[in-house]
Amino acid sequence: MNNKYNYKNLKWLWLSILIMLLDIGTKYWVKTHFWIGEVLSVLPGINCYYVCNPGLAFGLFTNASLYYRWLFVWIITLVIVAFIIALYKLIERPKCYSISYSMVIGGALGNLLDRILYGAVVDFIDVHIKNWHWPTFNVADIAICIGITIVTIRFYYDFIKNNLY
């Protein structure tokens, strides 16, 4: 019998849960030790800056109505489900796909919980060089970005390898 699904890939959901718990824990620490808008210099160019982002990544749609904010919740939920299904269906793929999908799932779950519970995502990592500031982010955002970067690089590598050789 040919099984077209790989249950073994679901074992990587432990990484999703770990990332989600780390994200929740760091956000809880920030919320219990800082006032909104408070800044603490951690290292040169890195601050702990407690902000709440009701919009999407990079502050997009910050002024969106409540209707659109809940629409984002549903869309993000569907994306998480799609990544879990994709993880489940990965067959004969390098392990980095499972790891990267799990990172995206964990990060998305962490930010989704904030949206549902508080109506906004808690961000607190502020990176800057002189007057240039990267948008404030959190542990979930780091996991999502690393996960997407890994799968993009690997996908590109596989594409080149399969089409040039």
From Swiss-Prot:
Keywords: Aspartyl protease, Cell inner membrane, Cell membrane, Hydrolase, Membrane, Protease, Transmembrane, Transmembrane helix. It is found in: Cell inner membrane. The chain crosses the membrane at residues 10-30, 42-62, 71-91, 105-125, 133-153. PROSITE patterns: SPASE_II. It catalyses: Release of signal peptides from bacterial membrane prolipoproteins. Hydrolyzes -Xaa-Yaa-Zaa-|-(S,diacylglyceryl)Cys-, in which Xaa is hydrophobic (preferably Leu), and Yaa (Ala or Ser) and Zaa (Gly or Ala) have small, neutral side chains. One of its GO terms (cellular component) is plasma membrane. InterPro entries: Peptidase_A8. It is an enzyme of class 3 (hydrolase). Pathway: Protein modification; lipoprotein biosynthesis (signal peptide cleavage). It is a multi-pass membrane protein. Belongs to the peptidase A8 family. This protein specifically catalyzes the removal of signal peptides from prolipoproteins. This is Lipoprotein signal peptidase. It comes from Blochmanniella pennsylvanica (strain BPEN). The lineage of its organism: Bacteria, Pseudomonadati, Pseudomonadota, Gammaproteobacteria, Enterobacterales. The gene is lspA.
